[in-house]
């Protein structure tokens, strides 16, 4: 007998099965973009594990590139709660899944369908026929993934998952990077690889580093003094009269006098006002500032908790951060953002071939190749979502004019000093714009901020000899083997973080896609899905009927 005072809320248990989610991809793309390679749907109450392998071939270049070219493959699990229509609410997701009205009273579609972003607003295609060939990036997005669209509705889960990944990474990198619309189909810019300047920040929390100690005993009234005061006058001079009805000395400040109307006020208007010169307050009377050891300890604890809170940057809801800071577990919070479940980075290796005909023995052709592989896994979740594999290809950025701080040191006082630096209360250095380019037009302007003595964690790339960059940035053929964006007057703008406007001058074919990509994914999914038995092809004669006819169905009659 069931205890009638208990209502069960455990879901019905089914025999678990396994389903395969395999994929082979052949596609192409350019460097400087985050390429969506493969997407696998994960249903509710499913977990998975498997392998992802990606191979990339770089198309022919006339010369062998001299700087590193990096490929990075990463696979994310994007839960459905990361999609905007659910607003991070598991209750909203469950209602939507069951086609019930949402919390606001109106139904919410579990699958957004036929939507794309046109640059200013989200558009719903009422007669979807061209999602794989349409404008606003749709043909590029679905074409890169190798997906075709028939005359039917198409859900937007893949593009939503893609943009959730991009936005998650941008928030983690810098608050200055723009967030994309979740239905934007244009391919996002890739991040620069092996960035040796990621320690430089545009701003920092100075209060977090300095700390603040409250001083008690300063809530008192202090006498206010002035060497000269007057009214109804546009200015004060040393010869100001003190006996007329329009002016007064400090000794008669409290006198009952009549205001005039001719004073030029700080806001530019004219009217009645007093003018004071050399104003000060006497703080020696009535005040007693105190700072206790408890105040110092409070400042230390405040700074420590502020550092913990800073780690939650990127979570949109302040109340969620407040709950986490109180030590309260928010079970669904981890399901509101993409989860990196596997990644690998590799550099291209090059194969150079020389011409064999007698007239062109100096001519060469170069191809590059890189292979990446890793395992992925995720436990069983009640949410479900999309597993998406993305690929980024970009050359290593070459800061040829990056400052060598030791070379510019002419005084030992400018070298690190353990005692002085240990006593430094902030341990933060101001980074000038000549850090990235010693020929910057405003070398002493502030680029950003970095940890103290950051310049002695050296990460230099020096290019010299025939490859030396000329002062006027004039084009030289030999330097065309360096594949990079030569930025004039670099700053902490979008170009500093993302591969914007990456050229294709090093390739023999500057029109076609520069990289050919093959990928193989093999996932085993633990699921509740019920599969039918394997079918056996049969002819017109039923095997079941044949066997039935052989059975003696008669019974003995008594």
Language-model features, listed with the residues they occupy:
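Intrinsically disordered, low-complexity segments
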Residues: 1-558
């Amino acid at each position: 007998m069931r205890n009638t005072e208990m209502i069960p809320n455990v879901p019905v248990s089914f025999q678990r099965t396994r389903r395969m989610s395999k994929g082979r991809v052949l596609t192409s793309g350019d460097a400087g973009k985050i390429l969506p390679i493969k997407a696998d749907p994960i249903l509710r109450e499913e977990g998975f594990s498997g392998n992802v392998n990606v191979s990339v071939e770089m198309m022919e270049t006339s010369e062998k590139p001299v700087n590193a070219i990096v490929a990075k493959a990463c696979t994310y699990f994007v839960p459905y709660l990361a999609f905007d229509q659910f607003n991070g609410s598991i209750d909203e997701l469950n209602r939507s899944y069951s086609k019930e009205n949402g919390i606001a009273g109106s139904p919410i579609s579990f699958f957004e369908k036929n939507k794309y972003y046109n640059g200013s607003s989200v558009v719903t295609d009422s007669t979807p026929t061209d999602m794989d060939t349409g404008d606003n990036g749709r043909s590029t997005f679905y074409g890169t993934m190798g997906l075709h669209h028939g005359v039917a509705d198409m859900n937007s889960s893949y593009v939503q998952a893609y943009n959730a990944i991009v936005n998650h990474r941008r928030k983690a990198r810098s608050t200055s990077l723009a967030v994309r619309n979740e239905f934007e189909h244009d391919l996002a810019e890739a991040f620069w690889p092996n960035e040796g300047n990621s320690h430089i920040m545009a701003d920092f929390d100075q209060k977090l580093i300095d700390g603040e100690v409250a001083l008690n005993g300063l809530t008192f009234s202090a006498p206010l003094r002035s060497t000269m005061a007057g009214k109804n006058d546009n200015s004060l001079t040393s010869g100001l009269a003190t006996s007329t009805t329009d002016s007064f000395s400090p000794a008669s400040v409290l006198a009952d006098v009549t205001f005039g109307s001719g004073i030029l006020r700080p806001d530019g208007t004219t009217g009645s006002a007093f003018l004071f010169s050399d104003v000060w307050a006497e703080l020696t009377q009535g005040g007693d500032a105190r700072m206790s050891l408890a105040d110092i300890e409070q400042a230390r604890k405040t700074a420590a908790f502020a550092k913990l809170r800073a780690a939650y940057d990127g979570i949109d809801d302040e109340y969620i951060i407040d709950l986490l800071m109180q030590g309260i577990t928010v079970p669904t919070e981890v399901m509101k953002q993409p989860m990196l479940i596997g990644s690998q980075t590799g550099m291209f290796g090059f194969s150079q071939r020389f011409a064999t005909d007698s007239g062109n023995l100096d001519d060469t052709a170069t191809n590059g190749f890189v292979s990446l592989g890793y395992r992925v896994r995720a436990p069983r979740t009640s949410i479900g979502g999309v597993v998406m594999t993305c690929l980024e290809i970009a050359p290593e950025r070459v800061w040829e004019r990056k400052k060598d701080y030791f070379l510019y040191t002419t005084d030992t006082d400018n070298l690190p000093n353990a005692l002085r630096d240990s006593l430094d209360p902030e341990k933060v250095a101001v980074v000038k714009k000549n850090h990235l380019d010693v020929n910057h037009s405003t070398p002493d302007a502030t680029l950003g901020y970095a940890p103290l003595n950051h310049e002695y964690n050296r990460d230099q790339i020096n290019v010299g000899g025939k490859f030396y960059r000329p002062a006027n940035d004039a084009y030289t053929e030999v330097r065309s083997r360096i594949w990079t964006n030569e930025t004039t007057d670099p700053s902490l703008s979008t170009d500093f973080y993302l591969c914007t406007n990456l050229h294709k001058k090093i390739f023999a074919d500057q029109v076609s896609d520069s990289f050919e990509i093959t990928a193989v994914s093999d996932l085993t999914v633990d699921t509740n899905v019920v599969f039918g038995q394997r079918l056996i092809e049969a002819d017109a004669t039923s095997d079941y009927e044949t066997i039935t006819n052989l059975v003696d169905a008669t019974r003995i009659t008594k």
